[in-house]
């Protein structure tokens, strides 16, 4: 059975996911067969495994850092918020039910056996499993029924590293406060602290670290610097507030609409590696005059279309599109580009039909069954945003409940393969000029040749030189992350904790 180590945090967005990614890569570099695990994840960023199951995007990234194929066992329970108090519950990769927060509070303990069974399957196949917690283990209002922090640590006998974010301030208070709110038997599982996102001279922290260690009898095992320009997907939407927009010199300006229920926003990270500045905007005044407007995926298409209307963003997008600004919609954003959206089963809300932006001659109807599959195929259309790309290979994954019908709009992609075998269907749509494009393919910009051709089509339209981008190697990014974190933490002590386990 695999040995275990767990990363918990004092709150959300302290960097648990990226630290787990780093540890996964470090253990892989050291020759171990390693896998990530998070029993329960609440996220709108999702990934589809080869089996067609949904998991959190963070666990897919962590699996990539491990050099293994993502599986539903890495995230057996995924919660996808649909409204402020309701979530769609994904269990072992498949939709289980949609329930309120209060209902889930009662339901969650029933899923503990499912979560532990997934962890045990991972332990049977690997040398090490790195477990990620959620939020904080000191959320005392949730403690009795949580199945993602101390409950998992205790059930699995997993030693815990507690991470805190020093960049936001108050890290020592948050670490000590977390320990104080844990029960005595829970504190026993905390074997070390990781102070994350530090800027400056680490030696200046020594007096505070001495107090922390004296008061809690738990050692600080690392001070990790604030990571900049890392082309690795981030899980928390707080990342959008911190997003700097590019990784080097840029010649294209891309504005991504920050929908209230935005999902899979990391679809566009790769664009920033090829000379584009990627900005997330939520107000009409922030749009400016971009070369491309992107309407991203959303868990709730109809409510987010209503938001676009109420905020004035819809009018602005339509006006700019009519003046020639390129517009791309992905998944829910693709549905929004059409003329009508129908929801006869009230899948998303009580609204059964709503007008879209009308930039594509399409209509979307929501069905009861969700499509979740990896795909591969090629570009079919050859104009505008897809100019010169006909026949270019693409791959990615689909997660949607809508079925989109094309009228005068032109199909954009031909899907030829899924994990089940050969396929033959069309995806996406473009207007005749190719200036407005929609697709259901998540991860499409991970395809380097397509990404480069897509951006160069915009450059040609803009009248600026095309770029022959450098080959982007995400594997090197994982190594870069691992090297920085390895140099910042006491791996000798972490290996000792891993080997000793909980006794």
UniProtKB/Swiss-Prot annotation:
Active site positions, chain numbering: 331, 442
Top-rank lineage group of the source organism: Bacteria
Domain GATase cobBQ-type stretches: 251-450
Listed GO biological process terms: cobalamin biosynthetic process
The keyword Lipid metabolism belongs to this UniProt entry's keyword annotation: no
Record's function text: Catalyzes amidations at positions B, D, E, and G on adenosylcobyrinic A,C-diamide. NH(2) groups are provided by glutamine, and one molecule of ATP is hydrogenolyzed for each amidation.
Name the record gives this protein: Cobyric acid synthase
Name of the gene encoding the protein in the UniProt record: cobQ
